[in-house]
Amino acid sequence: MCGIVGYIGNEDAKEILLSGLEKLEYRGYDSAGIAVRTESDTEVFKEKGRIATLRKAVDENVHSTVGIGHTRWATHGVPSQLNAHPHQSATERYTLVHNGVIENYEQIKRDYLADVQLKSDTDTEVIVQFIEQLAGEGLTTEEAVSKALSLMKGSYAIALLDKDDPDTIFVGKNKSPLLVGVGENANVVASDAMAMLTVTDQFIEIMDEELVIVRRDRIEIKTLAGDVQERKPYTAELDVSDIEKGTYAHFMLKEIDEQPFVIRNIIQKYQHEDGSTRLDEDIRAAMKDSDRIYIVAAGTSYHAGLVGKQLLERVSGKPTEVHIASEFLYNMPLLSEKPLFVFISQSGETADSRGVLVNVKKQGHRTLTITNVPGSTLSREADYTLHTFAGPEIAVASTKAYTAQIAVLALLAVDVANAAGKTLDFDLLQELAIAANAMESLCNQKDEMEQIARDYLSVTRNAFFIGRTADYFVALEGALKLKEISYIQAEGFAGGELKHGTIALIEDGTPVIALATQEHVNLSIRGNVQEVASRGAATAIISMEGLDQEGDAVVLPRVHELLTPLVSVIPTQLIAYYAALHRGCDVDKPRNLAKSVTVE
């Protein structure tokens, strides 16, 4: 949610900032703005809507080599030009951008800013006005920022310009992601490394409650208490081409097509020279020592976790629970004696999951993160990390991260089984390779998927996905994808639950897409399809070779039953994509959604 960029160097700052913000569009936003330092002033440009609108508003004649930028996703105050960032202090000495939520901003207003007339409805403006108030009492900017941030409760990532110190960007962070990049004769600030890859691939992690003073030729990191911190940069292993669409119309379609290659990449990354799949010994020991696994996730990652539970229990025999992070945070169940917590997050920054992680670590429990972003908060703070190696996922609706998470969970399940001395009747790497081939075959059947979307979903307001066992998990994910990008009220249900209430919603023409890839429930789910068809539903069945019947809409290549979600999800993703396309929706940036949910 939201994105921050900052630049100080010798090049034209405004173009670097705008380009950086465009690379952060995937995070979701409703307004955007930049501020640049000229020889005599700080120029602020901000607009409601897309960055393309902001570009038109920026004065091309303004030249600057220092600036900050922001994409906003409203939390306090409606989306508007007034509430967009950057915000300025009363005298316009200070200009600030901020991600996060300041929980005690009303108290700060009452206690310190009673005589200050605020211009916006945001918590962000309180920060910049408070900093100016403190500076007016004789504190240096560094001291004022440190004191202000030390009194803030909640999450924040900030970048600040000071008109009286034009060659410095002040940066602070707590519970919200922010990086500082080290370049040649230039330094940058970014919520995500990909925003500033054109400037540098060398980045430094900022830790919670730290203040960073960024200048052209040096970077100083301090705690809010003033203690100097030394930290070397790491190399961001990203390629600029990874964050470009290439010949594709949308990132989502590109990322759907990348999934077979992601699975093959995971095989390569986790396969040893002898062909085995041994994970880190510490992870193996933690899994073996635990008496129950608690998977904690949100959204698409939660759906991957449901598949992971089945894999862990059926392959390794390890009892597993799956919990929605935001619910677990405030309604923790009774735990086993030796729990291991597995956090699944594409970004590694999900605020609800991090809240759970912090809580369970305080209780002394071990934690494992499965994420797509090395160096992310969850990967840094968990005891152990498994990377999914899916590459940057730009479209807001997750596709390749989901299948990558399932593949890594499958590897984890097999590794636990091997460590326990269990004999498995299948070769996971071979079965994953077969699944990747099947996924690639389905990605080449786009015309069929587009036809289903056109026939069933072009004008409907509602749609249902049904399945049983593993197919039910995919039904949940398929419904989420459809509602995310097409705005159709789509729901996923267990086939056996239809008669317990949901069937009352079936009308003439109601689209019902059924998944039928599980042999032991194949006839049962087909019976459910007949139930809704007899009440007027327009039905389409996604089945698998060997289980298919005449009239099935899509027949998947045969894969190992435990890995069917990797394959059966592809048609649901493509159907959602084409449904959104035909309905004129913004596929990559659906309304009201953020890619990385960094506030609760």
Curated annotation (Swiss-Prot):
The protein's name: Glutamine--fructose-6-phosphate aminotransferase [isomerizing]
Reaction(s) this enzyme catalyzes, per UniProt: D-fructose 6-phosphate + L-glutamine = D-glucosamine 6-phosphate + L-glutamate
Domain Glutamine amidotransferase type-2, chain residue ranges per copy: 2-217
HAMAP family for this protein: GlmS
Active site residues per record: C2 (nucleophile), K595 (for fru-6p isomerization activity)
A GO biological-process term: fructose 6-phosphate metabolic process
SIS domain residues: 283-422, 452-590
